[in-house]
UniProtKB/Swiss-Prot annotation:
Residues 6-197 form the GATase cobBQ-type domain. The lipid II isoglutaminyl synthase complex catalyzes the formation of alpha-D-isoglutamine in the cell wall lipid II stem peptide. The GatD subunit catalyzes the hydrolysis of glutamine to glutamate and ammonia. The resulting ammonia molecule is channeled to the active site of MurT. This is Lipid II isoglutaminyl synthase (glutamine-hydrolyzing) subunit GatD. Pfam families: GATase_3 (PF07685). The lineage of its organism: Bacteria, Bacillati, Bacillota, Bacilli, Bacillales. Substrate binds at R128.
Amino acid sequence: MHELTIYHFMSDKLNLYSDIGNIIALRQRAKKRNIKVNVVEINETEGITFDECDIFFIGGGSDREQALATKELSKIKTPLKEAIEDGMPGLTICGGYQFLGKKYITPDGTELEGLGILDFYTESKTNRLTGDIVIESDTFGTIVGFENHGGRTYHDFGTLGHVTFGYGNNDEDKKEGIHYKNLLGTYLHGPILPKNYEITDYLLEKACERKGIPFEPKEIDNEAEIQAKQVLIDRANRQKKSR
């Protein structure tokens, strides 16, 4: 049996919206393809390398927890950036997405330094962008989830897709997330992967390609995931009509 290793960073601080469900989805989806997933929880980064890592995951947290996580992850920002540039798949949620950028501006105007992995920034406001969200993606098809964030993120990189219902990165450009090489960043909770198996398969497939192990096409029953996604799409459509 082939194996993949996931590094789950700052799991003790960044799991505000049960984002651990994304790890469970990756593990279960891989199991259906006879791939064993080993999850390494990393809360202290001193001396950490990415030599044994195939996928990394960073969840979301409060502003306070995010600041603590940023400080800890800054110790490995150079190898993290190198891994991303080398094509390592990664999924970052909300705060985990925000602090990959250069800065985070609080509602009172205070600028907090990010990891600076990529050239973008986030500005937080007191009113939050909350509710169901539906996205149309050239790569993943229809994506659904739930968003709840005060941050407005701005960048010129590729995105997960176009927002057809909800807000996304901000309340202006109708774009959601970031898609840079094999790095995915998003504001979608839910968690995102159980309802969007296409993204789960993407991360696993890219990890297998990079490691040189087969990711063979296999008939998998996706009916439960499809039905769950349709429930959110239908609910969003009803909300559209009532506005």
